[in-house]
């Protein structure tokens, strides 16, 4: 069985950042535990330019890891002068996606206009390079979809990661050719409506993720998340979709390689 964690932040695990030897030992443990749970590949998602450099330096020896390059909406103010550097870095062959980008009105409504500017620029770069975008949207789905449509984002496609929105929003995204990715939130007891939405998502547009080290699934909720826990998320999604775990693994793996135009 072959699972892919389509969104994680391996560099942000709760590990010793000051000792390089210990750092690599801890990463080895994290990845080996994931391998034991059939998680074979990982897309580690950058949240800032500084984060991208750090991640690439830290993880460059691991063939199982793919990279994205982007500036998270909450870091736009901090990296206000970095859009040109983002574009330059995005040409790197190791970068398979732009992001994560998008809008976050929950934590930073006051930077709404700046977030929108950065979001649009990510989309334009993605279209130019023919690379998908990874979208973060919190309390902002209406504006997120509006901008995607205005910027013709169907030309690059991408993922709405850690999806928690309505069925209506899901199908607006699907109509533009986007993929929908579900995280550990789908295992939470209160996620009844989200489970009902998942039932209606076409299998060919479905992806799975941990968003490690955040959003650990049940039975690990409250602990630091890690890619190994993708197996628990996959089991829950397979149950909801009424298919076998092996079938879900095959479908989501194929979807990942299709979206990012990668060879298996």
Curated annotation (Swiss-Prot):
Keyword Metal-binding: yes
Cofactor: a divalent metal cation
Family per record: Belongs to the metallo-dependent hydrolases superfamily. TatD-type hydrolase family.
Note describing how the cofactor binds: Binds 2 divalent metal cations per subunit.
Any one annotated GO CC term: cytosol
Domain of life of the source: Bacteria
GO molecular function list: DNA nuclease activity; metal ion binding
Keyword presence, Nucleus: no
Enzyme class: hydrolase
Protein EC: 3.1.-.-
Keywords: Hydrolase, Metal-binding
Cross-referenced SUPFAM superfamilies: Metallo-dependent hydrolases
One Pfam family hit: TatD_DNase
Protein's name in the database: Uncharacterized metal-dependent hydrolase BUsg_343
Binding positions (a divalent metal cation 1): 7, 9, 100, 211
Residues bound to a divalent metal cation 2: 100, 136, 161
CDD domains: TatD_DNAse
